[in-house]
Every structure is written in C-alpha cells, then in structure tokens.
C-alpha cells in the first residue's frame, strides 16, 4: 500500500510527483507535504472548520484539498509558478467532478468557483491578505528573504483587522527559524513532533505553531 497515492486517489487529485523545474535562489522545488504529517496537524486540533487557511506556496494543492476534506475549513492556495498553479486548477476540476458530479469549463481563476479550496497565481510577497484569513501554512516554499516580507504583510493585516492568527511551519529550515525569532509579534505556541514518521530522522521533522500577539 502507498498511503500518499491512496489518499490522492481518494480525493481524485495528482500531487505526488516532485517538480524542481522552477527552483531558484528564492523559490524551492515543489515537494508535497506528506499526508501523515497533515494527519498529525489535524489531530492537534489547531485548525478548525471555522478557520480560513492560506497555504503559502501551495504547489498542486494537496494541503488545501486534504484540510478542506478532513476538517471542513476553507483553504486558499497561493502559487507563483503558473505551470504548477495550472496543475492545482486541474486537480480542483477533477476533485469537484469526483465529489459533485460533472463540471464543465472550470475557470482558471478559481476564486470564481464556489468551493472550499481555491487557488491564486501570485507571488506570496505580493498577495493581499483578506481580513477573514487567519491561519497561514508554510513548507519552506521560498527564501527567508521572501518569508520576511510575507510575515510583515501578515502583521500589517493583523494591525488592520485584529483577530487570532496562527502560523504553521512544517520542517522549518534554520533560516526560517531565525527569521521567525526576529519578529517580536510572533509567539511560539507548540511543536508537533513528526520524527517518528521517518526512518532517517534529520531532527527537524516537526510542525511549529506560532501566533501573532
């Protein structure tokens, strides 16, 4: 049995294949967050059906489809690469067809679709955060330099609309941790250990949860 492919098949999506075609200094290769890691996040109950999650660097949309399906929350995926974004849109079309019946002419602008999972083709640092978005998910999608700008945007959104905001980081790099510790508004909440999921643990297999105070 292959858990990754089994869940993809269950959701009628294709997210398993690695893609480094657009990797550069500021943008990491596409690598899907493992489903068993997302299971641990769901079990922690840090995310509820009332949350609106933004997946920064969403790739082909796995996080959005799975959280929307298992938790019932809304998820918006932000992806800078137009080719990978198009694959996320194709996954959305096949997922909706699988769950709701035949779908004709799915729009590339998925904001037009009445679905719990949507996608937007824009760089994360240029994305304008909406007041109802309160959970932000990261799996090292871009450089610490871009992360710094994104964090500032989230903090500004908090100033404009005070609300509970959580930031979720899977397998954060040392550069990410350093950037997070440099932002005084961020408060470390908890760490979910994921190392038992891997035979060759690197010691950073965890989910770190922060909130804005």
Residue ranges and their predicted role:
Residues 145-206:
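C-terminal substrate-binding/active-site "lid" region of AdoMet-derived donor-dependent transferases
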Residues 1-48, 87-131:
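S-adenosyl-L-methionine
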Residues 61-65:
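Glycine-rich SAM-binding Motif I of class I
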Residues 50-57:
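Conserved class I S-adenosyl-L-methionine
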Residues 133-146:
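A short SAM/SAH-binding and catalytic strip from SAM-dependent methyltransferases
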Residues 74-79:
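Conserved SAM-binding motif I beta-strand of class I
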Residues 83-84:
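Conserved short alpha-helix immediately C-terminal to the canonical SAM/SAH-binding motif I
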């Amino acid at each position: 049995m292959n858990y990754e492919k089994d869940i993809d098949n269950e959701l009628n999506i294709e997210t398993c294949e690695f893609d480094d075609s657009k990797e550069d200094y500021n943008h990491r290769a596409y690598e899907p967050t493992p489903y068993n890691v997302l299971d641990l996040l769901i079990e922690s109950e840090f995310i509820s059906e009332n949350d609106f999650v933004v997946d920064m660097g969403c790739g082909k949309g796995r996080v959005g489809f799975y959280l929307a399906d298992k938790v019932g929350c809304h998820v918006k995926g932000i992806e800078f690469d137009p080719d990978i974004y198009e694959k996320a849109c194709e996954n959305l079309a096949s997922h909706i067809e699988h769950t709701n019946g035949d779908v004709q002419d799915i729009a590339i602008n998925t904001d037009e679709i009445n679905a719990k999972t949507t996608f937007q083709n824009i760089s994360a640092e240029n994305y304008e955060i909406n007041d109802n978005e309160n959970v932000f998910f990261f799996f090292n999608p871009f450089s610490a330099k871009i992360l710094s700008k994104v964090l500032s945007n989230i903090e500004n959104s908090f100033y404009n609309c005070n609300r509970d905001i959580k930031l979720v980081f899977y397998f954060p790099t040392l550069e990410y941790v350093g950037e997070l510790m440099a932002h005084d508004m961020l408060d470390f909440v908890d760490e979910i250990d994921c190392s038992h999921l891997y035979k060759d643990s690197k010691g950073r297999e965890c989910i770190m949860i922060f909130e804005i105070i």
